[in-house]
């Protein structure tokens, strides 16, 4: 049984730049850093960045960070002041802010739960949607 995200690993062009972004901009707790990689804690999930080539197009590939609604507006304002690049506008339920890290990884701040997403989907999504719960 899957209990949640264990970790997420992304390729980055510059480990030091990524390290500064995740610690100084997002406030993640650093675990380790080397020339080739760095690890951070985001709540109970760990994130690894590894020096490597980036794909040109990742479609909707991204990682969402859970955020309390009471912190959403303040956090988005901070990110905008720090000139992060927004890559997508939110088109679904809940509050979400989609943005890029310095290496172009696609991220999201999301203020909703799986339960509310399921409820929204069951009420609004049509077509070939199969629900298993």
What are these regions (language model features)?
Residues 1-16, 63, 119-133:
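N-terminal beta-strand motif that seeds the catalytic metal site of vicinal oxygen chelate
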Residues 14-29, 75-79:
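Amphipathic alpha-helical segments
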Residues 27-32, 66-70, 85-90:
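Short linear motifs in intrinsically disordered
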Residues 14, 35, 91-94:
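Short beta->alpha linker loops
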Residues 5-12, 54-78, 81-133:
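Vicinal oxygen chelate
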Residues 29-61, 69, 106-112:
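Conserved short beta-strand elements that form part of the metal-binding/catalytic scaffold
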């Amino acid at each position: 049984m899957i209990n949640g995200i264990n970790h997420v690993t992304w390729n980055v062009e510059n480990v030091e730049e990524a390290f500064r972004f995740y610690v100084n901009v997002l406030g993640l707790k650093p675990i380790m850093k080397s020339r080739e990689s760095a690890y951070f804690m985001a709540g109970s999930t760990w994130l690894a960045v590894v020096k490597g080539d980036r794909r040109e197009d990742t479609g909707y590939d991204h990682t969402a960070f859970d955020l309390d609604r009471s912190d959403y507006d303040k956090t988005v304002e901070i990110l905008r002041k720090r000139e992060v690049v927004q890559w997508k506008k939110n088109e679904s339920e809940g509050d979400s802010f989609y943005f890029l890290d310095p290496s172009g990884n696609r991220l999201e701040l999301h203020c909703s739960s799986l339960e509310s997403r399921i409820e929204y989907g069951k009420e609004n999504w049509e077509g070939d949607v199969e629900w298993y719960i």
